[in-house]
Amino acid sequence: MIRRLFLALAGLLVLTALGVAGTLVLDARPRATPVPVSSSPAAESSSDRTSSPAAAKSSASGGSRSAPASDLAREMDRLLTDGQADDAFWGALVQDLETGQILYERNPNKAFLPASNQKIVTTATALDLLGSTYRYETTLRFDGRTVDSVMTGDLIIDGSGDPTFGSVELRGADPLASWAEQLADMGVRRIEGRLIGDDNRFDDRPYPEGWDVDYITRQAGRYMGTSASGLSYSDNVVAVKISAARPGAPPNVRLRPAGTVKVRNEAQTSSRWRGSSVEVDRIFTGNTVHLTGTVARSYRGTVNVPVSNPTMFTLQSFVQELRAAGIETDVQVLDIDEVEEPPSDGKDLFMSLSPPLSEIIAVVNKRSNNFYAEQLFRTYGWGGSARGASKRTDAFLRRIGVDTRQLLVNDGSGLSRKDLVTPRAMVEVLAHMSDHPEKSAWFASLPQGGENNTTLEYRLHRTPVWAKTGSLRFVRALSGYAERPDGRRIAFAFFANNYTGPSYRVTRTIDDLVRKVAE
């Protein structure tokens, strides 16, 4: 555990004995299915593309381009220089996927911070390497004996990096609660020995390089800075439910799952009925949540706070579920790295299967889930590490013809400020995936303009667009596909970096650009 805590800081800075004949499999498949989207023709290779019709022009925000003028190019240039967002450093590439023609470009080979547009690269790589039917397995094993109603020995939860295990994003039976109830139904009344978490599918470094500590710690409730782990549960976050008490007293705090983290409550309930300034901070060196500030007398709210040690969080949550099922526990809770002599394989009791990858990448792209993205990134990475995932991503990109010399891949979510991508590389990935064998799953994973419960819910209504958003401080991006009235599908990538004006103006400009592409 000490090693994990040390690595966490480093990463931020730079049944069988009971007579069970087989394994009970829990299918965590959610109820909803993605909306199908029609496929598109393949794009031509880069060597066959026609020259750009974009206007030859330089601007304060755009650099130079040398290409014939076109109405689309003039309109897009106007949008980028009309004073709304001209202080941004802009990158853009727009390509007709039917003809391969470049319709517009601006700094297409310059490197930009992609923010969550990095998830396009991550999910494309995962879909190509793992396939849309890939499913994670999380197993409960037992090595010991059972006398009467008492299990004695080692219970091992063997993780595979499944981000959906107990997740609120893809609703289904809670696997830990189901396991506990099944044990109780089989007559178990007490468990003695060791409860061990095997998280070795991933390495022990929970954070990738380049995350902005100040930024992610101030984004409570947005799944920012969640630790990656080979054994994860409930999105690796604890829900801190806060409600007002009497004036002058600390607010009431309840945790879900209960008993999994400590709370240091230094907040107060004010005498006012409105106006709250409560802050919920995480302490990276331990599973402690710190509350400060004030809450109004009418306040009720929930903040999701990432836990620092997902493995111990999972094990402690299982202990709570066992007790809730009426099973007494006298167990030592251990990370497998703390066990001097690793337990034998024992026998499988239960297995939890994740939904297929096609549904997992839809969570990543439609809801921009950073935790799912990081788990997926390490899943296909060599050695279960961020560095191994970076190398494998680079190999995929080079295989499909992307020039990676100006690309940097340090994480799967795009939270890293050490990620770099060019507009050309992004469009080349989009073009490749538009004719990929898994293109149906690919298109179904992308948010559509105005689609409920996605990052485009309030944007681009009635515009035929499927695209991934991206946002960090001083970064806005949108990349994906637009469909024109004649049915032609256009791939586009728009990046805005280093602006000092209001972010909403940049976002509005990007949306206006996309509408022009779709005309």
Positions of the model-derived regions?
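Short beta-strand scaffold segments in enzyme catalytic cores
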Residues: A92-V94, T138-L140, S479
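Short, ordered coil/turn segments that flank beta-strands lining enzyme active or ligand-binding pockets
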Residues: L97-E98, R246, P485
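Residue-level preference for non-acidic, small/hydrophobic
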Residues: G100, K119-A126, L195, L231, ...
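Conserved serine DD-peptidase/penicillin-binding transpeptidase domain
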Residues: I2-A10, G19-G83, L129-D403
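Short active-site loop at a secondary-structure junction
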Residues: E105-T125, I361
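A short, well-structured edge-of-sheet supersecondary motif
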Residues: T81-E105, L334
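N-terminal glycine-/serine-/threonine-rich phosphate-binding loop
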Residues: G62-A73, E98-P114
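Small-residue-rich helix-loop
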Residues: F89, L103-E105, R367-N370, E374-E519
